[in-house]
Amino acid sequence: EQLKEALAQAQTDDASQDYAYAKEQLDQLSQSAKMTQDIYTVLQKYDIPNTMTNVMAMEAMVNDRNGVFRQIFGESAKGSHKEENEEQLARAKEQVLEDFGEAIASPEGLAAAQEQLAEVAENVMKGMIDSDDVTSLDIREMRLLSAQLSIGSMMAKEEQYAIPVQTESGVVGISLKVVRGDGEKGLVDITMETKLHGKIAATFQAKEHGVSGLIASDREDTKELLDSRQESFTAVLDSGNEADLHYACIADLDLNHFSTGVFGVDAPEQQETTEKQSDTTYQVQTTRLYHIAESFVRQVQDLLQGTDAQGADA
């Protein structure tokens, strides 16, 4: 609440300038009719108010997938924290990354990690607000970051997550979407993008017996790198059940429309499994789908950290 009041106070003197800036951004956004429709579709799907700020925040999330985490975990963010506070904030950031790594196994864990991320982001923004050289542009960026975090929390309630993951080249965001089906079946979509490895997307279908999946990249070398881990992927994805995995290089890979769509643009409506299934069946389904997600994310993180380190040494 204090941060909201500080942001509101800082915005008072340049409200008209903010409006002009927002209008300019929306004018630019409207030039891409397809992207504009996607953004409004996502906002409507998750019952998020289509305010100007939310539209701009969603547009930024779609176009700059790692932007939120770069602002939170980047070392260049301005601030007025004292040295001891900087150390405390750095430890909190490390803890959030560790907690997210452990949290992927369950929706409850991811919800708790999301709350911790919001607390760290609030401390980052407080430091910017207190900075002697804070500008109106900084204020706008903070408003956008605050809106993005709020949107992320609302989407997480529908099992659509943005997960920060540490690699040797920095923190990147992994998008995870879980779509439940009947019984123990369902879909798991995972997408990400890094500077060194380009776009990576995976979709897994949990069937009655085993898992089928497609793992793709827009770069041939990354596709071959992922293919080299086929034995590891197959072994861990579904607790010993058969895994039928395929790999592809797709030059024009569109992460926003891969499988169900990174933000659920193309996803079918979630089935009302919580009411129709027994608690036992629901928990078994949850354990299975989130195990698939956790296993793939861990494998990819280990793979990218290793190759990033090799690239840095080269």
Residue ranges and their predicted role:
Residues 1-314:
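Intrinsically disordered, low-complexity terminal tails
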